A protein has these predicted regions:
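A short, well-structured juxtamembrane/interface segment
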Residues: 17-44
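A cross-family acyltransferase "interaction/gating" segment
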Residues: 79-80, 128-207, 218, 225-226
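A membrane-cytosol interface segment of integral membrane proteins
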Residues: 89-110
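Catalytic-site beta-strand/loop segments enriched in glycine and acidic/polar residues
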Residues: 109-138
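Cytosolic-facing loops and C-terminal tails of multi-pass membrane proteins
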Residues: 213-240
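Polar-ligand-bearing catalytic/cofactor-coordination segments
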Residues: 90-92, 192-197, 211-214
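Catalytic core of membrane glycerolipid acyltransferases/transacylases, capturing the structured
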Residues: 2-13, 26-28, 42-96
Length: 240
């Protein structure tokens, strides 16, 4: 097996700039952000469901971490450069050896003091149901002795709310205008209590999925009730 790549920790100033920038992106798009629960400051593996590119923006707006991304993103203009300097862990789904390297890189990142976000479904969903969680990468938390934090991502908007989802062959440039046309969109982050890495990865994976499922019951994408849409929603201080 080849040696794991050297994991680059995010530069000290960059996460702060990304937090401000991410909140600015949501402000520009008119997306409100709300948080529930507490994401620990200690290094943790954040295990989330996946709806859209807005998921990453939401997490970066509230918590300092890096994340696992497919290698193709590295070639995207601007986004690829930012991701590389954030210390993103690249993975190649077409190569089995890449999985072992990704696990080693996540472990090294956690041991180095940085939390890692992974989307356990392995792809984006349409928000109607939770897809099966893949357990392989959660092995890294067991090796590093880091807690697993289930993170449920939900969203609401006035119809057509499914414009928040990024599915199929839709490109990022096609998705952004759809999100801009939404009325009263809101993204919610629901952090469940941390799970100690004391069990095998398959048990941990099921526990994480169950926690996310409880917080996305009824669908991760919901139509907003216009009568309840007047209050200004701010990011929870607990997630700051």
């Amino acid at each position: 097996m080849s040696a794991p790549t050297v994991v680059r920790r995010p530069r000290r100033l960059l996460p702060k700039l990304l937090r401000v920038g991410s909140r600015g992106i949501f402000g520009t798009l008119g997306i409100r952000l709300r948080g529930r629960g507490v994401i620990p400051r200690e290094p943790a593996l954040l295990v989330a469901n996946h709806l859209s590119w807005t998921d990453i923006v939401a997490v970066l707006a509230t918590h300092e971490c890096t994340f696992v991304a497919k290698r193709e993103v590295r070639r995207w203009p601007v986004v690829g450069w930012l991701a590389t300097h954030l210390g993103v862990i690249w993975t190649d789904r077409t190569r089995s050896r890449s999985l072992l390297r990704t696990i080693a890189d996540i472990e090294a990142t956690l041991r180095g003091g940085t939390s890692v976000l992974m989307f356990a479904e392995g792809t984006t969903g349409d928000g109607t149901q939770l897809l099966p969680f893949k357990s392989s990468l959660i092995e890294a938390a067991c090796r590093a002795g880091a807690p697993v934090v289930p993170l449920a991502i939900t969203a609401t908007a006035l119809p057509p709310v499914d414009a928040l989802c990024w599915v199929g062959d839709q490109t990022l440039l096609q998705s952004i205008p759809r999100v801009q046309r939404l009325s009263m969109p809101e993204v919610q982050l629901h952090a469940a209590p941390p799970i100690a890495p004391v069990s095998c990865r398959k048990v941990l994976t099921q526990m994480a999925r169950d926690a996310v499922a409880r917080r996305t019951r009824g669908g991760a994408i919901r139509a907003r009730d216009r009568a309840r849409s007047d209050a200004t929603v701010r990011v929870s201080a607990a997630l700051s």
